[in-house]
Amino acid sequence: MTLENLIKKMKRDKMAVGLLIELKPTQDNGEDMAHKVIDIIEQYQFSRQSIFMSLDYDSVQVIKKEKPQWWVGYCIYGSVGDIDDSIWEMDIDFLAMEENRASTAFIQKAVRHMIPIYIWTVDNTKKMKQYLDMGVCGLITNYPHLGKLTVEEYEKTHFQYYYYDGKGYPKTTLITGG
């Protein structure tokens, strides 16, 4: 299914869920891909329901430059021990990282730098609660209903303390898709 077809379906079915759109460029097509995504999102007026991320920093920077109000993130792959401190200077709204790479120390460092962390792909309640306890701001899951219930229960007894400066839009704690 194409992005365009998915958005049409979501609008038609009045689906009250946001999209995390991951750009996966190949062979230097990142800029072109980013512009095409921008065009589709604008054509269907879907920016308020969308956030964007990529392993390719240049691709998300195209979106950030063209649409600074849109929420964009950088996807970390690999060991957090291999990440240098320049990551905290990136022009991004959040970081997404693979669940088996997350550590309390890294998440707390992100909190100190006021960078929300989203963890993928978390598909069981115990792990969801564990990552929320560690201080993550969002969960990326293949089971949105389970994720939503877990987050709602968690928020009843825990203060949501991560920084949100009002720029961009989502105060997102759950993202669907894996």
Residue ranges and their predicted role:
Residues 1-71, 77, 90-93, 97, ...:
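Metal-dependent phosphodiesterase/phospholipase catalytic core, i.e.
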Residues 73-178:
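C-terminal active-site rim and adjoining tail of enzyme catalytic domains
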